[in-house]
C-alpha cells in the first residue's frame, strides 16, 4: 500500500484502540454513576474503566510515535495537520476555562443576598495573593521561559541543552504543583463554602490538573529528546507540549489577576 501511495498524507492502518477507548469511557461513565449512587460493583467498574482508558492512551500514543519516528509517515503535510488539530484543541480548552471565569464574574460582579450582597461572601477568609499565589506565578512564568529555551536549543541542534531546559521546566512544574497542594491544605475555606469556594477550587483545580497533564507531556518530550527522536525539522510533539504549557501559563495569569487579586479585595 505504501509503494502505491502518491500523496503526502498518512492513511492510518486499522486499529483496535478507538473501540477499546470507547469501551473504557463507557465503563468509566457507568461505573462512576453506580459508585455515586452506592451500587455494588460501581467502584470496581470505575477503576477498570480508568485503567482501560490509560492503557489505551499509552499504546495508541506509542503507535503514533512509531509511525512518526520509525516508519516516517509524518510528512510535512501530516505535521501541519497535527498542528492545526492541536490549535483547535487549545481553542476548546479556552472555551472550557471561559465557563469557569463566566461563573466567577457572574457571581462576583452582582453578588446575591444569599451571600450577603458582597464579594468575597460574608464569612469567607480569602488567601493573600502576594504570598504563595505570587510565588507560583513567578515559578510558572520561569517554567515558560525554560520551555522556550528548550525550543530554541532544539532549533539550534543543541540536544543536551534542550534536555537540560526540559528538566528545568519539569522541576519548576513540580514545585508549582507542590505549592498549589500546600495552598489547598492551608486554605481557610473549602469547595462547599459558598459560590466563592466552588469557583475557586473548580477553576484553580482544573488548572492544576492541566499542569499535571502538561508536566507528563513535557517528561515524555524530555525522554524522546534524550533518545534523539526529535530534530530541528521534526519536533511536532514538543511544539504541541510547548503551546500547551504557554496556554497553562496564560490561564494562570488570568486566575491570579481575577480570582486571587481582584476577587480577594
UniProtKB/Swiss-Prot annotation:
Enzyme class: translocase
Keyword Transmembrane helix: yes
Catalytic reaction list: 4 Fe(II)-[cytochrome c] + O2 + 8 H(+)(in) = 4 Fe(III)-[cytochrome c] + 2 H2O + 4 H(+)(out)
Spans through the membrane: 41-61, 85-105, 137-157, 162-182, 200-220, 245-265
Coiled-coil blocks: none
Location(s) in or outside the cell: Mitochondrion inner membrane
Cystine pairings recorded for this chain: none
Source superkingdom: Eukaryota
Topology in membrane: Multi-pass membrane protein
Major place of residence: mitochondrion
GO terms for biological process, alphabetical: aerobic electron transport chain
Keywords: Membrane, Mitochondrion, Mitochondrion inner membrane, Translocase, Transmembrane, Transmembrane helix
GO cellular component: mitochondrial inner membrane
Gene3D superfamilies: 1.10.287.70, Cytochrome c oxidase, subunit III, four-helix bundle
EC number annotated for this UniProt entry: 7.1.1.9
GO MF entries: cytochrome-c oxidase activity
Entry keyword Mitochondrion: yes
Function: Component of the cytochrome c oxidase, the last enzyme in the mitochondrial electron transport chain which drives oxidative phosphorylation. The respiratory chain contains 3 multisubunit complexes succinate dehydrogenase (complex II, CII), ubiquinol-cytochrome c oxidoreductase (cytochrome b-c1 complex, complex III, CIII) and cytochrome c oxidase (complex IV, CIV), that cooperate to transfer electrons derived from NADH and succinate to molecular oxygen, creating an electrochemical gradient over the inner membrane that drives transmembrane transport and the ATP synthase.
Similarity comment: family membership: Belongs to the cytochrome c oxidase subunit 3 family.
Subunit composition and interactions: Component of the cytochrome c oxidase (complex IV, CIV), a multisubunit enzyme composed of a catalytic core of 3 subunits and several supernumerary subunits. The complex exists as a monomer or a dimer and forms supercomplexes (SCs) in the inner mitochondrial membrane with ubiquinol-cytochrome c oxidoreductase (cytochrome b-c1 complex, complex III, CIII).
Name of the featured protein: Cytochrome c oxidase subunit 3
